[in-house]
Amino acid sequence: MRGAFYIAIALLVVRSRTATEIDPTDISEPYLNVVAIGGEDTRTTPKRYLRDGLAHSAANEERVKANVLSKSAKTLAAETEDWLRLSLSIGGHSHTPKSKRKVNLSPAKSQSGIRKKSTSINKRNYDKQVQADDPRLPEYLQIHQTFLKIPGMPHKMSLTEAVVMYGMVNRKVASKPGTKKNNEPLLRLMERSKWEDFENALDPMFMRLAPHEEMRKEYFHRLHTMYAKVYTFCHAHPSACTNKRAVSPLEKMIKVQKTKALLPLFKS
């Protein structure tokens, strides 16, 4: 009796091992990965084979399991890609938003550039630097010597300053001291002045201590004082300051004076 019991136990153990070798997986659990989102056909799965009672070899079973696992991995990858694409499109991050801001590629105009452009225009229109081949050079030199003799000048007048002020007093409408028409040419003269002009007009001690902007202001003030004296002198002595133009106010003053001198002769 005892021997039959041992034989039964041995048969059960052998049968259990045989079943395990045939299918190491637990067939009681459902194949969730096989019944997939992509709608895979479950008739090719090992579970279906066992349910239908079909006989199959171990090699065939391994082939079927590998096929099922590979298809499931592809399906999951495709589903993951679709979900990721959907989430990106909903979130608005699928495309990098293009910036609508327009970048101005043209260089900004600096103050130095504007000043340089303005200076070039002023120099073209008002630069009175006397050239050696200027046909009016003798006239300019003569008027320069005349202006140097005017008393009370704030500093020794340069030839350039004399030429600029000579043109100012001989305009069709003469520039009176302190007016806007007077300020503009003197301001242009100050803007294109060189360091030597400051040295000629300003005190050396003041130039060592004062900043450049203060030196410009002081020089501009001295130009105003100088022109006021030139204006007074030329209207008192028009023949010494005229440029012999009929439109010159000084020339008109000379003609008026000559007419007044001739009137008594006609009366007699």
From Swiss-Prot:
Annotated family: Belongs to the RxLR effector family.
A single GO cellular-component term on record:
host cell nucleus
Q: Which UniProt keywords apply?
A: Host cytoplasm, Host nucleus, Secreted, Signal, Virulence
Job description of the protein: Secreted effector that completely suppresses the host cell death induced by cell death-inducing proteins.
What subcellular locations does the record give?
Secreted; Host nucleus; Host cytoplasm
Q: Where is this motif: RxLR-dEER?
A: 48-63
How is this protein named in the record?
Answer: Secreted RxLR effector protein 6
Provide the species name. Answer: Plasmopara viticola
Primary gene name: RXLR6
Chain spans, region Disordered: 90-123
